[in-house]
Amino acid sequence: MQVTVEDLSSVKKVLHIEAPAEDVKKALDSAYAELKKQAKVKGFRPGKAPRSVLERLYKSDVESDVAGEIISDAFRDAIMETKLKIVGPPEIEPPAIVSDEPYKFDATVEIFPELSDLNLKEIELSKNMYKATEQEIENQIAMIRKNMSSLETEEEDRPAKEEDFVLIDYEGVCPDGQPDELRFTENFTMELGTGRILKDFDAQIVGMKRDEEKDFEISFPEDYFNKELASKQVKFHVKLKEIRKQILPELDDEFAKDLGEYETLDQLKDSIRDHLQQGYDRRSEQELDEQVFQALLNRVEFEVPETLIKHETASMVSEAERALSYRDMTFEDTGATKEDMEERYREPAEQQVRRYLLLDKIVEQENVELPEEELENAFKGMAESLRQPLEIVKKYYASDAEQMNMLRQTLLQKEALKYVKNLNEIKEVELELQETEE
């Protein structure tokens, strides 16, 4: 077998492969010999049909099968000889076999880029030190109180105002028909001012009294989440049946106890503070990681195989599709197609692939190893997240070598990132209050 490599780019090659004529002849002879044993040809006893007859009847199928075998074997040998680290399957258009001649074919492949050694030092890094504020804690408690509140009918005969809860019947009519959402709806509870349907809708109800009925028109904006109502003028008829006031629980130790995990209000506040701080700490670390990536990407240039970009894009699109499915939605419900989403995610997918390739290079260059305790911690984290016994998680990975290798590689990449950060001085930046509020 002969092979030459033609460079299309640093990550795309064409292998010009030639299998010798004797290999072709041997493969054809073997194929016809096997066919002769099995073929049932009219006028001949089993195993007695001459090759000329078999060629007349089965030549196309035999040569197609033989070409596939030669390509598979020769391509495998070519990869071993050239030592190319290919990405994904090759692109091959099998030519026809010509008897007694070498079999020549081209295989277009993508390969992993070869990154030059990286300078991992002298990277200017700063870490934003976010801190959970008392106001954020109070906001969280306010949300919990609201979720634990009850509603009481307002006995006073007064107009409805913002932050009231109201019980209404309503019906909407569009010029071109009635979307299901606008058909007569009875005993609908809503909080005024939140814009559950539309803030303009709430504004029309503010000022109404119990048992009052009202007709009004609302224009839905172009970007309204329900595309059936976007840009439409809708006539509504509303009857206000009750005004209800929200009764919040007292903010004391009993309030904390009712949540089932705390004995005092201070314990609840401490728990909220810890939870918020954990989120801020993760944010700080993610921002720091991104600084490392950007610094290293500025120090090395390399092409990314299209195969890897497409694979990562598909993964991101699938994740977005899965997230929407949890809300019983599809891409079409958001006004986008799958092709739109693929285009949207292509650039972030390429950046993510670059990060993976950088981390793999660091692992190789610096001989980064995975401490066994990190693997154990990963198993424990998954067991806790999935609410499964630790041994079940370990057994799953022990039975699936591919999944285990993927997990180890992911953890190794984290170790590589940690390695780079440990090589460089990190300046901690305490942020002012207004910078942490969102």
Curated annotation (Swiss-Prot):
Residues 163-249 form the PPIase FKBP-type domain. Belongs to the FKBP-type PPIase family. Tig subfamily. It catalyses: [protein]-peptidylproline (omega=180) = [protein]-peptidylproline (omega=0). One of its GO terms (cellular component) is cytoplasm. It is an enzyme of class 5 (isomerase). Involved in protein export. Acts as a chaperone by maintaining the newly synthesized protein in an open conformation. Functions as a peptidyl-prolyl cis-trans isomerase. The keyword Transmembrane does not apply. PROSITE patterns: FKBP_PPIASE. Keywords: Cell cycle, Cell division, Chaperone, Cytoplasm, Isomerase, Rotamase. It holds the Pfam family FKBP_C. GO terms for molecular function: peptidyl-prolyl cis-trans isomerase activity; protein folding chaperone; ribosome binding. Its EC number is 5.2.1.8. This is Trigger factor. It comes from the Bacteria. It is found in: Cytoplasm. The keyword Magnesium does not apply. Consists of 3 domains; the N-terminus binds the ribosome, the middle domain has PPIase activity, while the C-terminus has intrinsic chaperone activity on its own. GO terms for biological process: 'de novo' cotranslational protein folding; cell division; chaperone-mediated protein folding; protein transport; protein unfolding. SUPFAM superfamilies: FKBP-like, Triger factor/SurA peptide-binding domain-like, Trigger factor ribosome-binding domain.
